[in-house]
Amino acid sequence: MGHTFQKIYDAGTDSKIKYDYIHGKAALSNNIDSCNLVLDIDEYLTGDARNQDNYFIQFKKFYQRIYKGTGCHYVDWLNDVNIFNSRFPKTKPMPLNLFIYGHSLDVTDADILRKLLLADNSSTTIFYHNKEALESQIANLVKVIGEDEVIRRTDGSHRTIHFKQSSLDIV
């Protein structure tokens, strides 16, 4: 079983594209013990209760990502870019090119999305399936990074966030 982004961009190539499956991977060979897919509920607590009431913690994304050991390579990628750019300040900064495919940009992933989308020298392409999906992604992006930041990063010739309609149907 392949992954959509890899099927589109890595098919038959000797690509050096790096992937991070922050929500785990679907595989026919997985069973209930080996499946590392992350499924969640929205945060429903506020204030101190958010850290004290852990009755349903196993349903929160951050917990599942830790427990199931899903992708966190993005942290290393960000650190590598920052280290390179600080060590070689006179060279052209190393870009961070991100491609987000098949993701709702829901606020439950805000902790990761904020770090990636707001990173220095990042350029993000967000793929959408249809206009309805685009509407939802824009609305969710506003919840994640705020209206002013969305406008700043999607307007003008120096935009850092681009939306692109996916033109391929991969089964």
Regions found by a protein language model. Give the residues of each.
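A generic signature of intrinsically disordered, low-complexity regions enriched in glycine/proline
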Residues: Y44-T46, D80, F84, A110-K115
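Detector for Asparagine
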Residues: N30-N31, N36, N51-N54, N79-N85, ...
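Extended, H/D-rich, highly charged conserved domains that either
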Residues: M1-W77
